[in-house]
Amino acid sequence: MKLEFSGIERRLEKLDVCLKKLKPFRSMQKDEILKDPYFQDIIERNLQVAAQSVIDIANRIISLDALKKPRDYYEAILILGQAGILPLDFAQKLAPIAGFRNILVHDYLEIDWEEVNSNLQHIGDLETYMQHVKNWMREQESTQ
């Protein structure tokens, strides 16, 4: 692994840990989750860290590839699509996770559990993101 990829690798590992913690909750009914504040905390925190990992990885790739500086977290993910690191349609689908992360961090008094559940059901997109990032890293290593 190249030294400049170490931060990306660590975040990919953290993202993977979060996804493993979240997967068991995908099959639970929303009412069951809403009855248990511990379940809610586990889900919220791991979705927040997963989203932050996606954003941090995007920003590191942007820095390493000297891509356009993003105005915000949402745009950071879109830039990866514009650069061909992610398929553009996938980047557009994934970018709203940045806003969801902001809700979890800043609007924690008004958590919309429909939105939380929607993000929980789509954590497979984060696995797809991880695969695209790993592919990009392999391509970078093979061209050096």
Language-model region placement:
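Solvent-exposed interaction patches of small proteins and small membrane subunits
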Residues: 1-144
